[in-house]
Amino acid sequence: STSNDKPDQGYENTLVTAGVNTSFEQYQDLFANLGLSASYDDLRTTGAASDSLKKQSGDFSELAGNYGFRLDKRNRTFMPTDGSIISFNQVLPIYADKSYIANTFAASNYNQFTENVVNATKFYVSAVNGVGGDHVRLSKRRFLSTKRLRGFKRGKVGPRDGLDHVGGNYAAALNFEANLPNLLPEATKTDVGLFLDFGNVWGADYDSSIE
């Protein structure tokens, strides 16, 4: 159960979820995952909310299936120095008061530039769209985590409805990293790295005037 009570931002949201997932190696380095999830979403708006946000208030239930594939060619899982990992995941509605389809694609590539420098390039894109004219609920909209867009607070990038950041139908991020594992003595137990992040969250299907 997740409670996202933000009366100062115009809404209070409680989300209860349960699910089962399994993952297995379909072929060498190619993994598949299957899952089933059920959720109950209780969204309440306050007087501070915009009229368009108030229209989204209510109780919503859903049962969704998800599947995905992951091609993992990294030389090791923890702190890789070579190889790549590519993944795709999709969520499909089985039953939902407001149906949606979500797609997520991510790719990372690692290479050791020198003995003391490991480069990483990462790409992420995610989209969620309503089905049959339904609008995507607030709890299902896309945000970027602080790992994908560092230096910004989570949930503070993207479309705003009045003063409220409501997330988008689309999110994308591109990251460049340089890890310097041998810069400091091992006794310090400190990792040093450089990064450059680009990201964006956009799209508000329930109100085309929102940017």
Give the positions of each predicted feature.
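Transmembrane beta-barrel wall of Gram-negative outer-membrane proteins
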Residues: S1-S57
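Short, glycine/acidic-rich beta->alpha junctions
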Residues: E12-T14, S99-N103, E211
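C-terminal outer-membrane beta-barrel translocator/porin domains of Gram-negative envelope proteins
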Residues: R44-T190, L194-F198, W202-A204
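C-terminal beta-signal and terminal closure region of outer-membrane beta-barrel proteins
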Residues: D205-E211
